[in-house]
């Protein structure tokens, strides 16, 4: 019954994706309040409307795509899977595990996520393209309708990611129905919006951090369960091929599982047959039959997660991975080199100049952004006070970044 009304995995996935979108929205609204505020109430209202129109339009598009995708899946499910349903379920579980694992850790790094988006928003507002073809990119087009395009693109991107993640997490939930999607999506959006509200109005960071830690822990419990269930589905698929039928149709007793690969089996608590146990299946990956592969996968997942988090803590304190001087975790990601992100990284001085230039942004009557193109930072006057000035600059940068 629960998986017919509320899919727990879908809720946490939607909440995570909504979280990053509301961070961008809160940063933009804070920037407008600081840059315009009480100086021009009419322009302030106009730009705020641009922000919310962009959010609403991006959300409607994602909602339509997600509804169409889920509706098509459940209407064509039997035709797509046929007798290989367990095989596809296992594949979906593994894919969902990877995606959910990657999205969980950033929830613990709320401050870094906010800083990342402050820099992205600042660059998109103040940088000018040097090539003609770049004038059609978001960085330049955002000059005219920046307060519309930035939230629209962000909500659209996060929403499309959510559609993919929800498909992976929801489809792999035992006994899940299409009716189990609307409620967790709505509740996830409400919770994400509530966190954004607390960020905008400056709620206690400690209480917010506790909430995010609990949410991330539950998210990883779901992910570990998905990984274990993926291995279980593969074992069940092999057993069905050998037995020539669907093992679940045999109930809980003999003939319903592969006794040669099973570590334990209980003749009850079947998530496919007994109401209530499907909740534990969705949250923890519970099965009444424990295969060696599924149990190993569950424990290996937590072992790998502990190692990764330990490396991140070490890197946070030392600035590099153990036994190396210049290697960080991001350097192990192939996307870092494929996308050439090294050239896009900014030094602290470049960030200081970027935020200083952002301080000179103003809006005309049409809401178009104007930037002083020839603005330069004042140079240091004496070498004797250079170290004090650098420290002061870092404090100013920190204050400016927090004020956004």
Swiss-Prot record:
Gene Ontology CC entries for this record: high-affinity iron permease complex; plasma membrane
Location(s) in or outside the cell: Membrane
GO biological process, one term: arsenate ion transmembrane transport
Residue ranges of the TM segments: 8-28, 51-71, 87-107, 147-167, 183-203, 207-227, 294-314
GO molecular function: ferrous iron transmembrane transporter activity; iron ion transmembrane transporter activity
InterPro entries found in the cross-reference section: EfeU/FTR1-like, FTR1/Fip1/EfeU
Keyword set, alphabetical order: Ion transport, Iron, Iron transport, Membrane, Transmembrane, Transmembrane helix, Transport
Domain of life (superkingdom): Eukaryota
UniProt cross-references to Pfam families, sorted A to Z: FTR1
Predominant place of localization: membrane
Membrane topology per record: Multi-pass membrane protein
Family under the similarity heading: Belongs to the oxidase-dependent Fe transporter (OFeT) (TC 9.A.10.1) family.
Note: Present with 8370 molecules/cell in log phase SD medium.
NCBIfam families: EfeU/Ftr1 family ferrous iron transporter subunit
Protein role: Permease for high affinity iron uptake.
Descriptive protein name: Plasma membrane iron permease
Organism of this sequence: Saccharomyces cerevisiae (strain ATCC 204508 / S288c) (Baker's yeast)
């Amino acid at each position: 019954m629960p998986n017919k009304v509320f899919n727990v995995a879908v809720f946490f996935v939607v909440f995570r994706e909504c979280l990053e979108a509301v961070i961008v929205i809160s940063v933009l609204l804070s920037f407008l309040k600081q840059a315009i505020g009480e100086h021009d109430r009419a322009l302030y209202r106009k730009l705020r409307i641009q922000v919310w129109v962009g959010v609403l339009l991006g959300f409607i598009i994602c909602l339509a795509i997600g509804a169409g995708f889920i509706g098509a899946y459940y209407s064509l499910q039997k035709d797509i899977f046929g007798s290989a349903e367990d095989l596809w379920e296992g594949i979906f579980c593994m894919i969902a595990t990877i995606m959910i694992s990657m999205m969980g850790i950033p929830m613990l790094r709320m401050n870094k996520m906010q800083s990342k988006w402050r820099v992205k928003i600042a660059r998109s507002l103040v940088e000018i393209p040097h090539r003609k073809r770049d004038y059609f990119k978001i960085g330049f087009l955002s000059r005219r309708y920046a307060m519309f395009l930035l939230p629209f693109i962000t909500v659209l991107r996060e929403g499309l990611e959510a559609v993919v993640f929800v498909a992976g997490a929801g489809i792999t939930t035992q006994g899940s129905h299409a009716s189990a999607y609307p409620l967790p999506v709505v509740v996830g959006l409400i919770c994400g919006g509530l966190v954004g509200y607390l960020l905008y109005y400056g709620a206690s960071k400690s209480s917010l951090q506790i909430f995010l830690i609990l949410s991330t822990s539950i998210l990883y419990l779901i992910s570990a369960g998905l990984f274990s269930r993926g291995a279980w589905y593969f074992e069940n698929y092999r057993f069905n091929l050998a037995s020539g039928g669907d093992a679940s149709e045999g109930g809980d007793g003999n003939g319903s599982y592969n006794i040669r690969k099973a570590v334990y089996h209980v003749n009850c608590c079947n998530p496919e047959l007994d109401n209530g146990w499907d909740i534990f299946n969705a949250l923890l990956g519970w099965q009444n039959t424990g295969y060696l592969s599924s149990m190993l996968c569950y424990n290996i997942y937590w072992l790998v997660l502990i190692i990764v988090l330990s490396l991140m803590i070490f890197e946070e304190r030392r600035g590099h991975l153990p036994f190396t001087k210049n290697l960080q975790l991001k350097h192990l990601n192939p996307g870092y080199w494929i996308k050439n992100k090294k050239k896009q990284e900014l030094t602290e001085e470049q960030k200081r100049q970027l935020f200083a230039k952002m301080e000179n942004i103003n809006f005309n009557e049409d809401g178009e952004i104007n930037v002083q193109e020839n603005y330069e930072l004042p140079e240091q006057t004496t070498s004797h006070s250079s170290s004090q000035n650098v420290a002061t600059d870092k404090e100013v940068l920190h204050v400016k970044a927090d004020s956004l």
